[in-house]
Curated annotation (Swiss-Prot):
It is an enzyme of class 2 (transferase). Transmembrane segments: none annotated. Residues 283-428, 461-602 form the SIS domain. Catalyzes the first step in hexosamine metabolism, converting fructose-6P into glucosamine-6P using glutamine as a nitrogen source. GO terms for biological process: carbohydrate metabolic process; fructose 6-phosphate metabolic process; protein N-linked glycosylation; UDP-N-acetylglucosamine metabolic process. Keywords: Aminotransferase, Cytoplasm, Glutamine amidotransferase, Repeat, Transferase. One of its GO terms (molecular function) is glutamine-fructose-6-phosphate transaminase (isomerizing) activity. This is Glutamine--fructose-6-phosphate aminotransferase [isomerizing].
Length: 612
């Protein structure tokens, strides 16, 4: 969500901070700001809207400094205004903040009683005033921050500077991701390593509760008041490949990158048509013990988990439950022994999923219940990867568009690989079936490429959606979650109200919405549910609805009046959800472009949801 960039160097870092913010734009935001210290003054610029507005203001004001912090804000407390934009100041202190201070109103009341005047509606300004107040009692900035941190309740990351400390940047991680970029004669902080790749590829990943002091030449990290060392990790240069290239939008680029992303993801697990011997080898003992699976995820990742539930139960006979993380953690779930808890997250930092994981681990430990945890994630250095027993990476590369595409399909591929591995370990799937599915996985990128050849057809269909206000997506079996995903994509980026339903539920309510203004998107693979799905299509047409059908070549579904059909290549039934993701992604993309919305950064949304 919000993005932090900060640094301390020997050179002017204003442009570095602005460039860092530009590289964080994909996370979603509504305002941006920067503060630099120069000659014991805080020089600050803040603007509503795009980072480009801030960059123009900085260029005009010509502010500069070798110590500074910058921020993109996604509003949680207070509207998107210049006064609410970060950095916030109090006296000689400037602060940027990601996350939520849950007890900010109580702290604000106390500070107002002391005479502090608030100029914003944010929870962040509380932190600036608290540190300023603590400086009257402490001898240095680090000690003042240490005094304030225990007063803050919530999940947050902080970057703090002070005019009396022109070579010192203090940072705090408590429930919100933060990374230190290690340079030569300069050091930086950010919410995301991608922001710092132009200046360094060496990083230190802060852990929960860490407080760090950065100078030009040193990094000190403290955990629970004790000075500690955290390892410096060098990032593969390929991770920085995050430009749009020849594509108009990141989303379109990432849709077209899916065949290669699937190829990369399966290559880590398959040797020919068999699982590699070293694939998840260290997890085999845990896999042998599991009797149940619980998947925890949010948004698009939740839809991937829904599909995996069908696969777990139908392929290897392991009971599987799937829950939205924000619901799971607050309902006091029963922790069941010998359960594999799977967290799915593109970033590995999704706040609700991470909190659900930690709560589950805490409950299991308190009751001495044996469980295992595993993350499916696209970021090898993320909190979830570090905090689970095992992990399986989706090798999708950076995904910049807010609407997930290649992360989703690689999650599906990774989940299938995981299921094959668990089934093999537990001897609940035949070697012949593993070989068959492995063969189809290798073939999947080719089918995806062939499906992408229908882009022009889908563009023509999208023109019929531009003036619509509502839309239904219908599917059965593993394509019900794809219907949900298609509806999510359309509403995310085109702002058309869309709903996904299991087609069998049509008569239980949604059919009342169907009229000649309601487009209905149907996912119709050639499987054992096709005949029932065709009956649902007839029900829609009988009520005047207009059908947009994605079906495979052997389905027998053909064009007719008010029934538009895109025929895509036939694919193995187990893997059809991966392929059928592409047409709903392309449809949503083209509708959004035709409606003139911001495809890569849709309003009110963030790529990485790091607050609850």
């Amino acid at each position: 969500m919000c993005g932090i960039v900060g640094g301390v160097a020997e050179r002017n870092i204003a442009e570095i901070l602005i460039e860092g913010l530009k590289r964080l734009e994909y996370r979603g935001y509504d305002s941006a700001g920067v503060a630099l210290i120069n000659q014991q003054q805080i020089l600050r610029e803040r603007r509503v809207g795009k980072v480009a507005n801030l960059a123009e203001a900085v260029a005009q004001s010509k502010i500069s400094g070798s110590l500074g912090i910058a921020h993109t804000r996604w509003a949680t407390h207070g509207k998107p205004t210049e006064n609410n934009a970060h950095p916030h100041t109090s006296g000689s202190v400037a602060v940027v903040h990601n996350g939520i201070i849950e007890n900010y109103q109580e702290l604000k009341d106390d500070l107002e009683a002391l005479g502090y005047v608030f100029t914003s509606q944010t929870d962040t300004e509380v932190v600036a005033h608290l540190i300023n107040h603590a400086m009257t009692e402490q001898h240095n900035l680090l000690d003042a921050v240490r005094e304030v941190v225990p007063e803050l309740k919530g999940a947050y990351a902080l970057g703090i500077i002070h005019t009396d400390y022109p070579d010192e940047l203090i940072t705090v991680r408590e429930g919100s991701p933060l990374v230190i970029g290690v340079g030569i004669g300069e050091n930086f902080i950010s919410s995301d390593q991608l922001a710092l790749l132009p200046v360094t590829n060496r990083f230190v990943y802060l852990e929960e509760g860490d407080i760090a002091r950065l100078t030009r030449d040193s990094i000190e990290i403290y955990a629970h008041g004790v000075k500690i060392e955290r390892p410096v990790k060098e990032l593969d240069a390929s991770v920085s490949n995050a430009s749009k290239g020849e594509y108009k939008h990141y989303m379109l680029k990432e849709i077209y990158e899916q065949p290669e992303a699937i190829q990369q993801t399966i290559s880590q697990a398959l040797n020919g048509n068999a699982l590699r011997e070293d694939f998840l080898q260290f997890a085999e003992a845990d896999f042998n013990q599991i009797q149940n699976v619980q998947i925890i995820a949010c948004g698009t990742s939740y839809h991937a988990g829904m599909i995996a539930k069908y696969w777990f139960e139908q392929l290897i006979g392991v009971p599987c439950q799937v829950e939205i993380a924000s619901e799971f953690r607050y309902r006091s779930p029963v922790i069941v022994a010998n359960t594999l808890y799977i967290c799915i997250s593109q970033s590995g930092e999704t706040a609700d999923t991470l909190a659900a994981l930690r709560d589950t681990q805490k409950r299991a430990k308190a009751k001495d219940i044996q469980i295992s945890t595993l993350t499916i994630c696209n970021v090898a250095t993320s909190s979830m990867v570090r905090e689970t027993d095992h992990h399986l990476l989706t090798l999708a590369g950076p995904e910049i568009g807010v609407a997930s595409t290649k992360a989703f399909t690689t999650q599906l591929a990774a989940l299938m690989l995981l299921i094959l591995k668990i089934g093999q370990v537990k001897e609940q799937i035949a070697a012949e079936q593993i070989a068959e599915i492995a063969s189809q996985l290798w073939h999947c990128p080719k089918v995806m490429l062939d499906t992408l050849q229908h882009n022009a057809e889908i563009l023509r269909l999208s023109e019929l959606f531009v003036e619509k206000q509502h839309c239904l997506f219908l599917g059965r079996g593993t394509h019900y979650p794809i219907a949900l995903e298609g509806a999510l994509k359309l509403k995310e980026i085109s702002y058309i109200h869309a709903e996904g339903y299991a087609a069998g539920e049509l008569k239980h309510g949604p059919l009342a919405l169907v009229d000649n203004e309601m487009p209905v998107v149907i996912l119709a693979p050639h499987d054992d549910m096709l005949d029932k799905l065709k009956s649902n299509m007839e029900e829609v047409q009988a009520r005047g609805g207009e059908l947009f059908v994605f079906a495979d070549e052997n389905s027998g579904v053909r064009e007719k009046d008010r029934q538009h059909v895109v025929l895509i290549p036939e694919v193995n039934a187990w893997l059809a959800p991966i392929v059928y993701s592409i047409p709903v992604q392309l449809l949503s993309y083209h509708v959004a472009v035709l409606r003139g919305t911001d495809v890569d950064q849709p309003r009110n949304l963030a790529k990485s949801v790091t607050v609850e």
